[in-house]
Curated annotation (Swiss-Prot):
Lineage, top ranks: Bacteria, Bacillati, Bacillota, Bacilli, Bacillales
Signal peptide: none
Stored Pfam families: His_biosynth
Protein name as catalogued: Imidazole glycerol phosphate synthase subunit HisF
Molecular function GO terms recorded: imidazoleglycerol-phosphate synthase activity; lyase activity
Annotated family: Belongs to the HisA/HisF family.
Pathway terms, separated by semicolons: Amino-acid biosynthesis; L-histidine biosynthesis; L-histidine from 5-phospho-alpha-D-ribose 1-diphosphate: step 5/9
HAMAP family: HisF
């Protein structure tokens, strides 16, 4: 039986972890290396870092952060945000990341997925999809640029294409549920999980341990990601894992 993974997510801007509500009202949440060590001790299975600094200066800082984090961590970590070329992937992976996450760049240039998978192997390539339900198409639409721009892509079709091109994992964020803390988007997660052959990481909406149970059992997710509930200490990775274990979920 495949082990389910719990993954905290850190948004990094200019070398610091920040947290906000729907991409705005950002507040400093500390040093990424210290937080990474904290989550590692708590029993996180992996970590995701999203670089939200748009600046070139911020990008250099991110490489330094990745190097420092890699020196401290035993668990795998993924870095996303602003990775636009094979060279960008090389830089981040050489700095010590285990995987790179492609979002907007992959939509703009789907060939980037293929290039990355051919060069590094599918296990290094995560395609992140920001999804929002659209009644006009009766399904979910793909958004880019941090959820600001709607595309013509339908989520399930795009997820399948990403996997065909070599994505080893899909990081699926529900924009409808994000930050609401009312639970993950079960319908979205299940639909994508059943359509692709690679692991799906559910993201957006975690409010308590029960939500993780639901997304694993009903949403068929392989992993679940959360940010604010862990950062704000509303619950901990340890507590979530204990809750899941008691209910027979196979976790590390």
């Amino acid at each position: 039986m495949i082990t389910k993974r719990i993954i905290p997510c850190l948004d990094v801007k200019d070398g610091r972890v920040v947290k906000g509500v729907q991409f705005v009202q950002l507040r400093d949440a500390g040093d990424p290396v210290e937080l990474a060590k904290f989550y590692d001790k708590q029993g996180a299975d992996e970590l995701v870092f999203l670089d939200i600094s748009a600046s070139h200066e911020g990008r250099k800082t991110m490489v330094e952060v990745v190097e420092k984090v890699a020196a401290q961590l035993a668990i795998p970590f993924t870095v996303g945000g602003g990775i636009n070329s094979l060279d960008d992937m090389k830089t981040i992976l050489r700095a010590g990341a285990d995987k790179v996450s492609l979002n907007t760049a992959a939509v703009r240039n789907p060939n980037l997925i293929t290039e990355g998978a051919d060069f590094f192997g599918s296990q290094c390539i995560v395609v992140a999809i920001d999804a929002k339900y659209d009644e006009t198409i009766g399904s979910w639409r793909v958004y880019t640029h941090g959820g600001r721009n709607a595309t013509d892509l339908e989520v399930v079709e795009w997820a399948k294409e990403a996997v065909r091109r070599g994505a080893g994992e899909i990081l699926l964020t529900s924009m409808d549920c994000d930050g609401e803390k009312n639970g993950f988007d079960i319908a979205l997660t299940r639909t994508v999980s059943e359509a692709v052959s690679v692991p799906v990481i559910a993201s957006g909406g975690a409010g308590n341990a029960k939500h993780f149970l639901e997304v694993f059992e009903k949403g068929k997710a392989d992993a679940a990601l959360a940010a604010s509930i862990f950062h704000y200490k509303e619950t901990s990775v340890k507590e979530v894992k204990a809750y899941l274990k008691e209910r027979g979920v196979n976790i590390r």
